[in-house]
Amino acid sequence: MNASDNGDGPRLVLARHGRTAANVAHILDSRPPGYPLDELGEAQALQLAARLAGWPLRAVYASRAVRTQQTAAPVAAAHGLPVTVLDGVQEVDIGDLEGRSDAAALALFDEVYRAWWLGDLGARTSGGESALDLRARFLPAVEEIVGGVTDGDVLLVSHGAAVRLAAAALLGETAETFYVPNTGLVVLRRDPQGWALESWDTAEPVRGDVTAGGTPA
């Protein structure tokens, strides 16, 4: 998907942030400000900026997490745009599992995560959010940033689980979506009938990446 696309209506470009030390160590990290990008994550952000250099970006948004803002920064700079921090699009909160990396914690989150894709959107970890909670805050934020846009692209840098859950909701699906790698993109186009999927970056999940079936990132 690139700047030569001639479709009608604005596009929402959902991006997952670059890699962090928490991704590498399989630490459950859902709450802002969270971990910053590591060295590879910074390189991935620059690669994303190069990839999107010719895209007709109208605005660049990021969640309240440091890693999403760092990922968005080089993209925004290349287009002469600011990075606007947007409430409501942070990762799904994992409650009492925050900061843990032990096998028991990862298994507990994976159980809840899989329940969502089986249709139990109200499932949650102790003290955490459900998929319904995520949708209730994420979807109004999308409407806020895209509602007045008639053409071009709006970039929103968010998180692995959040992107998957939000995209599924926008597309009217509850079935499992694809894994999104670090700085992977999900491109949706809005038309009078709603949202349509244009492209979805995916790859073989990195070993231990919980957003493949589990961990927030």
Residues covered by each model-derived region:
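Acidic, low-complexity terminal tails and accessory targeting/binding regions
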Residues: 1-11, 92-104, 147-152, 168-217
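Phosphate-coordination/substrate-recognition cap region in phosphate-metabolizing enzymes
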Residues: 2-3, 7-9, 47-113
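Short, hydrophobic/glycine-enriched beta-strand segments
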Residues: 11-17
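Loop-to-helix element that buttresses phosphate recognition and phosphoryl-transfer chemistry
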Residues: 19-75, 124-139
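Phosphate-handling substructures
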Residues: 22, 36, 79-137, 196-201, ...
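Active-site signature of alpha/beta-hydrolase-fold catalytic machinery across serine-
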Residues: 74, 165-169
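Short basic (Lys/Arg) and small-residue
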Residues: 159
